[in-house]
Design a protein with these regions (language model features):
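Conserved N-terminal subdomain of the carbohydrate kinase-like
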Residues: 1-41, 212-226
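Short, structured patches in soluble enzyme cores that scaffold and shape functional sites
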Residues: 6, 17-19, 48, 77-79, ...
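Flexible, glycine/proline-enriched loop segments at strand-loop-helix junctions
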Residues: 13-25, 46-53, 69-72, 104-106
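Short beta-strands and strand-loop turn motifs
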Residues: 14-16, 41-49, 76, 94-99
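Hydrophobic alpha-helical segments and helix pairs
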Residues: 23-62, 66
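Conserved phosphate/ATP/ADP-binding segment of small-molecule kinases
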Residues: 57-145
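Conserved phosphate-binding/catalytic region of the ribokinase-like
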Residues: 83, 111-226
Length: 226
């Protein structure tokens, strides 16, 4: 994927190519490698669309193998791939509102509706549902918690790009979980990483001092009384 930035007119041009193709042998080799190296408690991130040639159940197969190893899968994909993969019960899913609407089959126009939709997947066995609200933050749901997390004050810098913010969010969450941080601390780090990415020339290359600065401004509002 290529992103061209035209600063003079504040415009981005996105070039998306199909990418490489894989064979069934390639897919099986990757699953075998995951089986061989994955340990209990590990975090595996499955992100983006499937490569050409991969089975529509490829992510679901990986999730199943990881569950057998007591590893945690963070799933960040969309469309039919998300619908198929979520049935294998990853540890965490991160749809945006439109992707959640596609999963549920109807519009979600309020935070309460989004919360109810997220809780459907919690009841099915997904442990964490993170619904991205774009600039308005995220709705984060587990069996015991329901929170709206957002950045209360942006740094006084020029925004560069939104490309990679979702990846930075997932990366921050994964790091926090790997460090056994609390759910609240994981959300704060995830939001801080995603927000810091707005000011980065390279997607995902966030500056730790800026992440720390933003983290102190992240707010968590309970949604339990919605």
């Amino acid at each position: 994927n290529i992103t061209l930035q035209t600063a003079a007119i504040d415009q981005e041009t996105h070039i998306r190519t199909p990418g490489f193709a894989v064979t069934e042998t390639d897919s099986l080799a990757l699953i075998h490698k995951i089986n061989r190296h994955t340990q209990p408690g590990d975090i595996i991130i499955l992100s983006g669309s499937l490569p050409r040639g991969a089975s529509t159940h490829f992510y679901a197969d990986i999730i199943t193998h990881c569950r057998h190893k007591s590893a945690r899968v963070f799933l960040d994909t969309s469309g039919p791939n998300m619908a198929t993969s979520v049935q294998a019960l990853p540890f965490l899913i991160k749809p945006n509102v439109a992707e959640m609407e596609a999963l549920i089959g109807h519009r979600l126009t309020t935070n309460k509706a989004i919360l109810n939709a997220a809780q459907c997947f919690i009841r099915q066995g997904v442990e964490v549902v993170i619904v991205s609200l774009g600039k308005n933050g995220i709705i984060a749901v587990t069996q015991t918690e329901a929170l709206l997390a957002y950045c209360d004050k942006l740094p006084s810098q020029k925004l560069i790009t939104t490309v990679g913010c979702g990846d930075a969010l997932v990366g921050g969450l994964a790091l926090a979980y790997q460090q056994n941080k609390s759910f609240a601390e994981a959300l704060k780090l995830g939001i801080a990483c995603a927000t810091a990415n707005l000011f980065s020339q390279e997607p995902g290359m966030v500056a730790p001092p800026l992440v720390d600065e933003i983290k102190s401004t992240v707010k968590l509002d309970s949604l339990k009384n919605l």
